């Protein structure tokens, strides 16, 4: 089932845990909005997007190392990805500085200092409000810091 032109439910729910990971109702709706309003513009600008993690049900989230107990992934509101053939920094800079995307958080993430491995992008308003929107951060595997141009 397609969520948008280029993204499917299967792609956005893939997990290596072996646990059931099926979004329903509100989570499925949020996934559709996420794909249409955030991931599609990235794909249109740069080309194919490889999703590392989309929806994560509570069991899958609990089995994911380093995942927040309050992750927007559990609500279908976030995705971790990279763009095939593009540097993470190029895509991230475009999202934060050049696009008009209305995101909640854009995070350049990695598990080793100075080595980002994916971009986390989550829905903004009305899913997040106020200062929790348009947050651009860098995560080095230990701490979050504001993104600096």
Which ranges hold each PLM region?
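Short connector loops at helix/strand junctions that flank enzyme active sites
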Residues: 46, 74-78
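Extracytoplasmic cell-surface/polysaccharide-interacting catalytic and binding patches
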Residues: 1-44, 136-149
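Non-catalytic scaffold segments within catalytic domains of secreted glycoside hydrolases
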Residues: 66-72
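Amphipathic alpha-helical interface surfaces
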Residues: 34-38, 60, 77, 87, ...
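N-terminal start-of-chain detector that recognizes signal peptides
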Residues: 23-24, 50-56, 90-95
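Extended, low-complexity, intrinsically disordered C-terminal regulatory tails
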Residues: 39-66
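Glycine-rich, flexible loop/turn motifs
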Residues: 3, 60, 70
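Catalytic cores and adjacent binding grooves of peptidoglycan-active enzymes
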Residues: 70, 79, 83-149
